[in-house]
Amino acid sequence: MQIELKRLQKKLKITFVYVTHDQEEAMTMSDRIAVMRAGKILQLGSPKEIYERPNCRFVADFIGESNIFHGKVEAVNDKLLDIATENGKLLSSGEGFLEGEDIFVSLRPEYLSLSKTALPGFDLRGRVKDFVYTGSVTKTSIEMADGSEVKMSRVEDNSEFKEGDTVYLSWDPPHSVPIHSSGEGEEEHET
């Protein structure tokens, strides 16, 4: 039905305003999405922009599944941020951040990688809690030292790891999204 409505909208060349709480429906049917909270638009953009580059923690948590790391910027090297968290160091890519700034980093589960040793710039270590095979992907839960849980969702089965193994987390820095923590970037947008 969603695809048929999208085809009809294109055929008739009219604008649809569609209100939904179903994220998959919004992503499937929309050219542009407005994520709202308390009557204010927090982010306006294409489904891809909203999903891959959330501008605040609320949007990162609201649209899809996201791992959120809280930390402090230790160094800024061009667009690469060295960030210290309670669970170790990580790298992210972003502009407009200052050394010493308190930030959040959003990472979608499909971008997370596991290894048996720490990779340069990363020393986030956790323990494999469990695996769930869903057919198309394997979902992995990793328990961090502070008790928080990080989610990974990959096509690969990670058969080299088993429950209870110590693993190191990493990702390609441009796949993570740094978010200012002061006000969490939740300014309203003009439409």
Kindly give the residue locations of the regions a language model identified.
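Residues located in well-ordered beta-strands
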Residues: 46, 58, 72, 125-127
